[in-house]
């Protein structure tokens, strides 16, 4: 695959083309994304998987994270999920992932007031689609994550980092590594983006440009 850097709009358009024109189900892309993140977590020396927390939003980025948690759980990795947001408003594909995780018995936590015991945190709150500043409860969670001793893996983009220019949208997760899907993002190659994304892996999950 040719190395190119894309914007959030291009990422959306490429997703739409792959799903609606090519016919690859969005759920398949979500599984591939989660598998790429899971594999990187298992192979990287930056992560101690003694105790893992996946912080998942209610959009598709969160669905990726929930699937990561399930894959780790099935490999006997001690992992829990914190779902950030109203589960009644969760996206369609993420709802499917949530049900699968529950059926497998992946444990959930209702609060994350104490992150000191976790060795790895997976940031799956917001991906490339973030268009507003991170505030309120989510900003508080970002601060919790950044102040924890855990190493952080970001899914697609660190939460709070603008995918187009790397600007911080209010506040942002500082990750040790980021697995971004199919194409690198413009925001990840900016000075700030590199600082907050850490080591970037571009995972080929089968999304292509029109």
From Swiss-Prot:
Keyword Repressor: no
Cofactor(s) in the UniProt record: K(+)
Catalytic activity: (6R)-NADHX = (6S)-NADHX; (6R)-NADPHX = (6S)-NADPHX
EC number(s) recorded for this UniProt protein: 5.1.99.6
Broad class of enzyme this protein falls into: isomerase
Domain called YjeF N-terminal: residue spans: 11-210
PANTHER family to which the protein is assigned, alphabetical: NAD(P)H-HYDRATE EPIMERASE
Name under which the protein is recorded: NAD(P)H-hydrate epimerase
Naturally occurring in which organism (per UniProt): Oenococcus oeni (strain ATCC BAA-331 / PSU-1)
């Amino acid at each position: 695959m040719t190395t190119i850097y894309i914007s959030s709009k291009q990422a959306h358009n490429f997703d739409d083309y792959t799903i609606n024109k090519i016919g690859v189900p969005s759920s398949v892309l979500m599984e591939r994304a989660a598998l790429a993140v899971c594999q990187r977590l298992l192979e990287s020396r930056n992560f101690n998987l003694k105790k893992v927390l996946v912080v998942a939003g209610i959009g598709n980025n969160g669905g990726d994270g929930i699937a990561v948690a399930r894959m780790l759980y099935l490999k006997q990795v001690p992992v829990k999920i914190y779902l950030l947001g109203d589960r009644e408003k969760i996206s369609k594909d993420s709802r499917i992932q949530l049900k699968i995780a529950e059926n497998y018995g992946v444990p959930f936590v209702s609060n994350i007031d104490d992150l000191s015991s976790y060795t790895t945190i997976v940031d799956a709150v917001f991906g490339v689609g973030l268009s507003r500043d991170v505030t309120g409860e989510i900003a508080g969670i970002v601060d919790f994550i950044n102040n924890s001793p855990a190493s952080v893996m970001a899914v697609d983009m660190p939460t709070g980092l603008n995918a187009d220019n790397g600007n911080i949208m209010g506040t942002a997760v500082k990750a040790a590594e980021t697995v971004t899907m199919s194409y690198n993002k413009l925001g990840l190659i900016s000075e700030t983006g590199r600082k907050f994304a850490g080591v970037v892996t571009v995972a080929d999950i089968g999304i292509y440009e029109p």
